[in-house]
Amino acid sequence: MTAEEFVKAVKAEKEVSLELYFSKHHETLIGNLINDIIENGATRDNLHELINQVLNENCYSLLMALDGEASLGDTQISYKLFDEEENELTGSGEIESAAYEQFMQ
């Protein structure tokens, strides 16, 4: 797995979560809260965009922290992340670049 593939997997997981939150076929706590807010006048599209942006920023921040480019909590250190074949995914800046492309553009 490359750093770019790792970032794409994080994005895919975010998309699955977002779809689940807005699904009419699955009941989740977040989905119930979304439905309550919609019943009080917010639009589904506006909520979807808001939650999408929140998840994008959270995923981006976490990936930046894993790559040593931002703090995680109040600590900024470089982490080493390896795939199952012991290839290092961090340290080269590839996560930072791929994360920006996937979550911030």
Q: What are these language model-derived features?
A:
Residues 1-42, 67-68, 72-74, 80-82:
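N-terminal low-complexity, intrinsically disordered segments
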Residues 42-94:
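Amphipathic protein-protein interaction modules
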